[in-house]
Amino acid sequence: MALEPSRYLDKKTWKMTPAMIRARQPYFKKNMIALGLLLGITTGVYVYTFNLSHKDNDFIDVPIPPIDEKELAVLQKEFNDKKN
């Protein structure tokens, strides 16, 4: 059978036996430190990349052309028609 429990799992509840918990205990602290380090590095790279890519607004010096009232009314009508 593919899902037969090992001798370190309770056959009824599939929970770890006390022997398995004792066997894993020396590695728990190191694994949590490694997990924290891995998550910290990943988060740091993500935040650094996000801040680097959103630092400059490339279009800040591009002037926005003025729009007259007729064009604005046409655009608003088109928007409202698409919305409904």
From Swiss-Prot:
Any one annotated GO CC term: mitochondrial inner membrane
Mode of membrane association: Single-pass membrane protein
Residue spans crossing the bilayer: 31-50
Topological domain ranges for the Mitochondrial intermembrane compartment: 51-84
Stretches assigned to the Mitochondrial matrix side: 1-30
Keywords, comma-separated and alphabetical: Membrane, Mitochondrion, Mitochondrion inner membrane, Transmembrane, Transmembrane helix
GO annotation terms (biological process): mitochondrial cytochrome c oxidase assembly; negative regulation of mitochondrial translation
Classification via Pfam families: Coa3_cc
Compartments reported by the entry: Mitochondrion inner membrane
Entry annotated with the keyword Mitochondrion: yes
Record keyword rRNA processing present: no
Family annotation (PANTHER family): CYTOCHROME C OXIDASE ASSEMBLY FACTOR 3 HOMOLOG, MITOCHONDRIAL (PTHR15642:SF3), CYTOCHROME C OXIDASE ASSEMBLY FACTOR 3, MITOCHONDRIAL (PTHR15642)
Assembly, per entry: Component of 250-400 kDa complexes called cytochrome oxidase assembly intermediates or COA complexes.
Similarity remark: Belongs to the COA3 family.
Protein name in UniProt: Cytochrome c oxidase assembly factor 3, mitochondrial
Phylogenetic placement of the source organism: Eukaryota, Fungi, Dikarya, Ascomycota, Saccharomycotina
Gene: COA3
